[in-house]
């Protein structure tokens, strides 16, 4: 038989034995269950599935509503200096590190560290705590966007006028274009805009503080339920379904962003808005807060230290060149952030010109941009209903794929702890439904009349930059100084066929830990207690609760170290050495002999063991 025919036979053979059986989770093989082995792990159907899933996961709301405002606030074009320093010194190296760890170990965010360095398994648990808390409150934004989308299907947008039941006598419509003198004469009085009253009085029904939760907002609760149902059905069949959903959710927002960009650039006042966005103020670089904002924005926008990128990477084939795609995805992420600034600030410049105010008076970040500034802007445009629908569909899709990718990362990490149980039959689907239900019930605390205060508390503390910097530091330390960056480069070379440039391992060993440490220290030094809308001050007990949320993830790293040392027998130095030794060589050689390419580090009883046969995989 010719060599080509032999290779085709091997491909057909392995394609058949990896085919899912009816009624089983994807990747479950009958022989695995018969022999009591963990079911076969799923793999991405194609390269584009992985690329779009990662793109959808980390190109999200922060790119559209956070980066442009930070750039404007922190010196315009000058902000790009610390941004790119953190990008190449921290963001890209940690992003690639997490993806390649998942690919190298074929494990999720927790069990990958059990293989790499058991003493640092707390890194995985810290990531899961962060992403679990993030999944509770991030989806609330999508519930708000869903509500606004439904409200947009009206001939007259409900936040355009002051003639509704929720409006107060202080509500003042934008009459600037018709009567500039009327606006000027009333600008000093205590008036509010209809869009602000719609947001605070209709959507949120905002109470006076966090200690007055008030009644449940059933309209928002139903929107939240609908978003959770969509999220569940996007991931319930694993990466095979997720990889297909992102073909729409990850690409359509870019098309709509392009439409909004073109529309914004054609509005009067757009040039002034872009000037405010990019005009460099080098003196702002003397402020440590600028560097803190740059560092935290990088870690937020790249969705690192959450376990999600590790989980997505774990579904790659071993010989997949993820380094190439990680670099391209990094360009896509930062490029989207930069271009979004033109789309947003061109419209804010138009608003400022129409109202006759400085752009600083209309520039907003976060929910203020999405649910106050932009809705107000569309009321000033022709065809306001069309632009409102377009914007909130984009917002919903940007957040939706980020949400279900983060949930997928959480599920993958937890399922990998008990694969024999949770990958069998429909156990995985039931487990996903349980996680979604529990998270939905916890999220109901944020759709009450005082829910906005709870949301801000979670947003400020639970997944704060301090937590992400803490996890990133230990990730780099464990790989560079415990496992060994050169050893890890050997594994990367075995996977992708060449060694990446040395800047990656230098970043893991020195640059990234230094950046994380400096940013971590300055974040604590510059810490300011949380306030809402710069007016409401949170009570002491709420601040304490916020710090408990932050520490709940950070404490995992030292706590797991202590537990592992206590559970291991022998003298302290022997236990320490044992827990610092990678687990994957013996385990892969014995349990998955031949399933992984040969590695010189695979030793069993002090003898090297090569695979006995070859599994042929189709390159992505």
From Swiss-Prot:
Q: What is its main location?
A: membrane
Reactions catalysed, semicolon-separated, are: 4-aminobutanoate(out) + chloride(out) + 2 Na(+)(out) = 4-aminobutanoate(in) + chloride(in) + 2 Na(+)(in); taurine(out) + chloride(out) + 2 Na(+)(out) = taurine(in) + chloride(in) + 2 Na(+)(in); beta-alanine(out) + chloride(out) + 2 Na(+)(out) = beta-alanine(in) + chloride(in) + 2 Na(+)(in); hypotaurine(out) + chloride(out) + 2 Na(+)(out) = hypotaurine(in) + chloride(in) + 2 Na(+)(in)
Q: Which residues are glycosylated?
A: 163, 179, 186, 190
Stretches for region Disordered: 15-42
TM region positions: 50-70, 78-97, 122-142, 218-236, 245-262, 298-315, 327-348, 381-400, 430-448, 465-485, 506-525, 545-563
Its placement in the membrane is given as:
Multi-pass membrane protein
Keyword annotations: Cell membrane, Glycoprotein, Membrane, Neurotransmitter transport, Phosphoprotein, Symport, Transmembrane, Transmembrane helix, Transport
Topology check: give the Extracellular ranges.
143-217
Keyword Cell membrane present in the record's keywords: the answer is: yes
PTM comment: the record says: Taurine transport activity is down-regulated upon Ser-322 phosphorylation.
What are the recorded GO MF terms, alphabetically? Answer: gamma-aminobutyric acid:sodium:chloride symporter activity; taurine:sodium symporter activity
- Topology feature Cytoplasmic, residues: 1-49, 564-620
**Name this protein carries in UniProt:** Sodium- and chloride-dependent taurine transporter
From which source organism is this entry? Bos taurus (Bovine)
What gene is behind this protein?
SLC6A6
